[in-house]
């Protein structure tokens, strides 16, 4: 498989492969930052979730992170999740729930071009922009994800949350 340099090439590859081939497609991903800038949106506080494409098979979401933005510790409602670091640096911490406590099992930093994978069998994770600049990450979910469970720090329990987008790109705008 050839390297993938554009968003249109990525979408075409995802549309024309089986779900089992997603890891191979993503390992060939070399998207430059400017490919995704049209899909960015920012707010003064907190990260944004920007839907680029959503089909019955998958969903591509661009997350835009301000300095110190972080997700809560969360799962993916049984879906598989790949995170491709587009710009900046994000740290990922993974957790297992043991003896009614969350235990950190891994901490890694993602730099541009790096890819990470997560599913619920691996536990839970949190993503944090602990760099000194904004960051963007491209998330591929197989299948689309509508809910997740997140860890409520105040109550020390997991709660279910409906996921929302800050922006949605009409699929017809992404030309194949």
Annotate each PLM feature.
Residues 127-131:
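Asparagine-centered strand-capping/turn motif at beta-strand->loop junctions
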Residues 1-36:
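N-terminal leader/capping segments at the start of a protein or of a new domain
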Residues 97-125, 163:
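Short acidic-glycine-tyrosine-enriched beta hairpin
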Residues 62-76, 120-122:
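Conserved short histidine dyad/triad with adjacent acidic residue
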Residues 67, 78-93:
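Glycine- and acidic-residue-biased ligand/ion/polar-headgroup-sensing regions
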Residues 38, 42-67:
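A short glycine-rich, His/Asp/Glu-containing loop-to-beta-strand
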Residues 82, 133-147:
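A short hydrophobic beta-strand segment most commonly corresponding to one strand
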Residues 156-176:
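Acidic/histidine-enriched, glycine/proline-rich intrinsically disordered or flexible terminal extensions
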């Amino acid at each position: 498989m050839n390297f993938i340099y554009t968003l249109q090439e990525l979408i075409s590859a995802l549309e024309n492969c089986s779900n089992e081939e997603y890891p191979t497609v993503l390992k060939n991903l070399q998207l430059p930052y400017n490919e995704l800038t049209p899909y960015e949106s920012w707010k003064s506080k907190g990260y944004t979730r920007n839907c680029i494409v959503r089909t019955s098979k998958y969903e591509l979401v661009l997350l835009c992170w301000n300095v110190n933005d972080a997700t809560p510790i969360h799962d993916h409602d049984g879906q598989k999740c790949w995170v491709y670091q587009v710009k900046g640096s994000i740290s990922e911490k993974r957790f297992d729930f043991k003896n009614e406590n969350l235990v950190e099992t891994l901490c890694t930093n993602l730099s541009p071009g790096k890819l990470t994978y997560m599913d619920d069998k691996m536990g839970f994770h949190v993503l944090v922009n602990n760099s000194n600049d904004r960051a963007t990450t491209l998330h591929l979910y197989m299948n689309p994800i509508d809910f997740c469970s997140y860890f409520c720090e105040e109550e020390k329990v997991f709660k279910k949350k409906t996921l929302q987008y800050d922006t949605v790109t009409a699929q017809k705008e992404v030309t194949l």
